[in-house]
Design a protein with these regions (language model features):
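Conserved phosphate/ATP/ADP-binding segment of small-molecule kinases
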Residues: 146-230
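Short beta-strands and strand-loop turn motifs
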Residues: 101-103, 128-134, 162, 180-185
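Hydrophobic anchor at the start of a short beta-strand
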Residues: 2, 52-54, 78-79, 159, ...
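Conserved N-terminal subdomain of the carbohydrate kinase-like
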Residues: 24-25, 48-128
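Conserved phosphate-binding/catalytic region of the ribokinase-like
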Residues: 197-289
Length: 289
């Protein structure tokens, strides 16, 4: 079974307008509401590709109920822990002459709630796949991903991590099956400017040397770069199209990679499907279908 973890899901309220004028009333041209969160996005695309999975994480309040109802309507399996306080956050994404995001904080997560998540994680079996995606809420120990991976290190579980900076660097010692930073996140991790594919490849190799089995670097319009545990290097170009939406493209790439690998057991084919899924979402108003 494939499991995804979204610690701080959201309702994404996406609005489009010609221009955003601060200090005055603005009228939108179009508005949509979507369940959000990197792990939830991965679950959505995996389901579209025919791979049943279970979404784990935390929800709360009326907004959390909306997320669950939306996922059930799409025949997505979820096993969220319902918190007794607050409400699942609402993120406002404004698309005008430039994109602006206003993200909520989310509810408090107690130690008791965390233990409920650990109990679910402990039930994973050999051969399962676990996707840890996104940020960790400020109310939670920033070692949470490390703690999860430590609990599973004696099991044969493929763990995929899509996180930034120290959240990612600190789990490499547990040899994740796949990590997927983008090129900008790679620059931030090493405090460098990467000007070429060769530069990106060199620093991706550093992540591999630190413990990651496979390193997938998404590069926006420049495609994606994959370094495999078999010492292979693959580069995928991006199909031509009009970019309508950057939200969820990286998550779609992760889902496509997992599905492609399960389909063929070949990393090159996994990259191809991952890149195709990422582009499909980028060329859509919402996640690809």
């Amino acid at each position: 079974m494939i499991y995804t973890v979204t610690l701080n899901p959201s309702i994404d309220y996406v609005i489009e307008l010609d221009s955003l004028n601060h200090g005055s009333v603005n009228r939108v041209n179009e508005e949509n509401i979507y369940p959000g969160g990197k792990g939830i996005n991965v679950s959505n695309i995996l389901n579209e590709l025919g791979y049943k999975n279970i979404a784990l994480g935390f929800i709360s309040g009326f907004t959390g109920k909306y997320i669950v109802d939306s996922m059930i309507a799409k025949n997505l399996n979820c096993d969220f822990i319902e918190l007794s306080n607050g409400f699942t956050r609402i993120n406002v994404k404004i698309k005008s002459n430039e994109e602006t995001e206003v993200n909520g904080n989310g509810p408090n997560i107690s130690e008791e709630d965390l233990q409920k998540l650990y109990d679910k994680i402990d039930n994973l079996k050999n051969g399962d796949i676990l996707v840890l995606a996104g940020s960790i809420p400020s109310t939670v120990d920033d070692k949470l991903y490390e703690n999860i991976m430590k609990r599973l290190e004696d099991k044969n579980i493929k763990i995929v991590v899509d996180a930034t900076k120290n959240l990612l660097l600190n789990v490499l010692k547990y040899n994740p099956f796949l990590i997927k930073p983008n090129n900008h996140e790679l620059e931030e991790m090493f405090n460098v400017k990467l000007n070429s594919i060769e530069d990106i490849s060199r620093y991706a190799k550093k992540l591999q040397d630190m413990g990651a089995r496979n390193v997938l670097i998404s590069m926006g319009k420049d495609g994606a770069l994959l370094l495999t545990e078999n010492n292979e290097v693959f580069l995928s170009n991006t199909p031509k199209g009009t970019v309508k939406n950057s939200v969820g493209a990286g998550d779609s790439m992760v889902a496509g990679f997992i599905a492609g690998y399960l389909n063929t057991n070949k990393y090159e084919e996994a990259l191809k499907l991952g890149a195709a899924c990422g582009s499909a979402t980028a060329f859509s108003n919402d996640l690809a279908t």
